[in-house]
Structures are given as structure tokens and as C-alpha cells.
């Protein structure tokens, strides 16, 4: 597979934030009389505000916004257990050394994403697309289209690296190549992605003299 740049999801792709996410959302579910497993099954890969609107249907936007602010603070400050996933730091460092453009494109808000990126010790991206920068979150294509644009690349020149069904669908809808890493077996359209891997450690990247990037 050939490309010119990478668009990485953050949670579940570059960082293991599952313990923190499950703590925050399970506590939120219990406070609202909901089954934690139902909430956790819905939220993966989606913007927090989308999940809150789903589970707080009928509530005012002011109530939902207040709940979002509270939850955002919890997720941005309670980072215990968050670590870089195997291969993440090595891959990003290699891209930087080779001069290959890459971005982080996440459904998380800026405070939450920045906190998790920092605690995991990841290299700084050239472009950081968070929930605030798009009107429609994953699985819509907006975030990945913006990421490609900010890198100065066409969507078809980019490879999206994702673990969540919503993110895989977003990358495909944007017209990007897609690598699914540790994605659920029942992910819709999984048969349409370019590669299905279990770990970032399986990705080998080589930059050609003409600027093309070969992924194996």
C-alpha cells in the first residue's frame, strides 16, 4: 500500500485509555440510573457530546452541556492507567525521523485528548484534530477530511489508522486508505479496509525518494 501521510485515532489506537474511559462512563451511567455495559457499548469511538445526547434524550441542551463539562473535567484529570499502546511511540518517532506527515484525529475534546497524549508520552503531532474542530463526529467523514486538509494532502493520499467501528467507517467515508488495528470482528465494512492488524508493531513504513510511503 502507498500513501503520503497518516491520520491516527488516539484512544484505543495510540493509547490504552480503556481503564480511564470505563471508570468515568461507568460512574456516569450509575449516577443516571443506566446500565454501565449499555453505555460502554455505545460510546466507543464517538464524541462524548454525541453519547450524552443519546442517553439524555429529552433533556435541554443546557443540561447536556453542563453534564459534558463535568464529564470532560473528570476524563481530563483522572488519567491513571493510561499508557501508549505497543509500537505507538516507535512508529510515530520513525515517521518524524523520515519526514512523513501525520496527524492525530480523535473524537475526544481538546482537554481530554491533550491530557491522554501527554501522559502516554507520545511525540507531538503536526496536526491535532479534536471534537471541537468539526460539526459532525465519527462515523461521519468530517474529522478525517479536515486532518488530510491540514496536512496538505488529498484524502486518498492518507492512511487512517483506527480501532473503533465508528472510526473505520469515518475513514472509509472520507475516501482514505484504512488500517484497522484491534478492531472488533463485527466492525461494519471491515472487509473494505486495506489491512487488518492486531498491533501497531506489525506496521513497516518506508519512504521512497519521490515522497511516496510504502506500508507493509
Swiss-Prot record:
Optimum pH is between 6 and 7.5. It is an enzyme of class 3 (hydrolase). A divalent metal cation binds at residues 9, 11, 163. Requires the presence of a divalent metal cation for activity. Can use magnesium, manganese or cobalt. InterPro entries: HAD-like_sf (IPR036412), HAD-like_SPP (IPR051806), HAD-SF_hydro_IA (IPR006439), HAD_sf (IPR023214), PGP-like_dom2 (IPR023198). Disruption phenotype: Cells lacking this gene show a reduced growth rate at high butanol concentrations compared to wild-type. They also show a consistent change in the level of mannitol, D-sorbitol, galactitol, L-tyrosine, 3-amino-3-(4-hydroxyphenyl)propanoate and N-hydroxy-L-phenylalanine. GO terms for molecular function: cobalt ion binding; glycerol-3-phosphatase activity; magnesium ion binding; manganese ion binding; mannitol-1-phosphatase activity; sorbitol-6-phosphatase activity; sugar-phosphatase activity. GO terms for biological process: carbohydrate metabolic process. Pfam families: Hydrolase. Its EC number is 3.1.3.22, 3.1.3.50, 3.1.3.23. It comes from the Bacteria. Its cofactor is Mg(2+); Mn(2+); Co(2+). It catalyses: sugar phosphate + H2O = sugar + phosphate; D-mannitol 1-phosphate + H2O = D-mannitol + phosphate; D-sorbitol 6-phosphate + H2O = D-sorbitol + phosphate. Sugar-phosphate phosphohydrolase that appears to contribute to butanol tolerance. Catalyzes the dephosphorylation of D-mannitol 1-phosphate and D-sorbitol 6-phosphate. Is also able to dephosphorylate other sugar phosphates in vitro including ribose-5-phosphate (Rib5P), 2-deoxyribose-5-phosphate, fructose-1-phosphate (Fru1P), fructose-6-phosphate (Fru6P), and glucose-6-phosphate (Glu6P). Selectively hydrolyzes beta-D-glucose-1-phosphate (bGlu1P) and has no activity with the alpha form. Belongs to the HAD-like hydrolase superfamily. CbbY/CbbZ/Gph/YieH family. This is Hexitol phosphatase A. It comes from Escherichia coli (strain K12). The gene is hxpA.
Amino acid at each position: 500500500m502507498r500513501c503520503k501521510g497518516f491520520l491516527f485515532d488516539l484512544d484505543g489506537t495510540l493509547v490504552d485509555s480503556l481503564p480511564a474511559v470505563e471508570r468515568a462512563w461507568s460512574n456516569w451511567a450509575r449516577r443516571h440510573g443506566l446500565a454501565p455495559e449499555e453505555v460502554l457499548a455505545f460510546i466507543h469511538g464517538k464524541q462524548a457530546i454525541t453519547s450524552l445526547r443519546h442517553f439524555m434524550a429529552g433533556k435541554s441542551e443546557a443540561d447536556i452541556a453542563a453534564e459534558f463539562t463535568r464529564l470532560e473535567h473528570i476524563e481530563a484529570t483522572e488519567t491513571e492507567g493510561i499508557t501508549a499502546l505497543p509500537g505507538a511511540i516507535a512508529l510515530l518517532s520513525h515517521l518524524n525521523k523520515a519526514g512523513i506527515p501525520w496527524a492525530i484525529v480523535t473524537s475526544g475534546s481538546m482537554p481530554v485528548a491533550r491530557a491522554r497524549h501527554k501522559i502516554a508520552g507520545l511525540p507531538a503531532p503536526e496536526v491535532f484534530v479534536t471534537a471541537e474542530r468539526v460539526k459532525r463526529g465519527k462515523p461521519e467523514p468530517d474529522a478525517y477530511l479536515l486532518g488530510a486538509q491540514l496536512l496538505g494532502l488529498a484524502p486518498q493520499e492518507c492512511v487512517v489508522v483506527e480501532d473503533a467501528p465508528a472510526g473505520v467507517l469515518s475513514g472509509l467515508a472520507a475516501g482514505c486508505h484504512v488500517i484497522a488495528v484491534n478492531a472488533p470482528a463485527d466492525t461494519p465494512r471491515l472487509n473494505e479496509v486495506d489491512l487488518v492488524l492486531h498491533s501497531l508493531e506489525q506496521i513497516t513504513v518506508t519512504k521512497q525518494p519521490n515522497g511516496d510511503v510504502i506500508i507493509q
